[in-house]
Amino acid sequence: MIYLKTYFYSPHEIKFLKLNLLEAYDYIDKFIICEYNMRHTGLPSKNDYIFEEHINEFPEELRDKIIYLKCDIKDKVIPAYDNEHIMLSHNVRLMRGYFQSQLEFEDEDIVISVEADEIIYGHKYPDILKSVEQHGSVALNLWQFFYKPNYLWINKDWVAPNIAKFKEHKNEYPANWRYGPITFPERVGCHFCYCMSVDEM
């Protein structure tokens, strides 16, 4: 099985989830979307499980591949409002890897792990899937857009999303599902960093 996996926290990210599903649909078996009741800081989410309110924004013919996980992690996060180290090493890592505890996977399953605003080009899927068969785990390089979706950050690499066989991370929990031992040699998509209004921030 081939899975695209992400998590989201805000209505402004729905458009990115739709883009990822549209690009990936012909190449994946399922799109795992996790929504959490807590934030990276360890504080409660401002929006309590809103994904189902937006499901009708996805084309009906594409919804069959969505697996929506409503994730309660209030007893698992650590308060980290003033502690970036704990926020990144524990809370963020938990949110990236929590899906492992909610579904069953086989060793040879492939997981493409992206943040909500990281979009993989559909035409690059055959190449990255071939690469993961050869290497087991690969970091993906994206074009970086900042603040507006047409503000390209020239000469900026964004190397963070990971594509890996499940067996590469199955003995870590929660696994970070970021980066990788090698980086795919071409840019394979776009990262829309802080592409939102001031109110949405």
Predicted regions and their residues:
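Conserved catalytic core of nucleotide-sugar-dependent glycosyltransferases
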Residues: 118-201
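A short acidic (Asp/Glu
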Residues: 15-19, 42-46, 79, 120-129, ...
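Active-site-proximal specificity loops/subdomain of glycosyltransferases
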Residues: 36-113, 122
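Short His-Asn-centered micro-motif
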Residues: 5-11, 34-35, 113-116, 140-143
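N-proximal low-complexity "stem/linker" segments adjacent to membrane-targeting elements
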Residues: 1-26
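Short, solvent-exposed beta-strand-terminating loops
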Residues: 34-42, 192-197
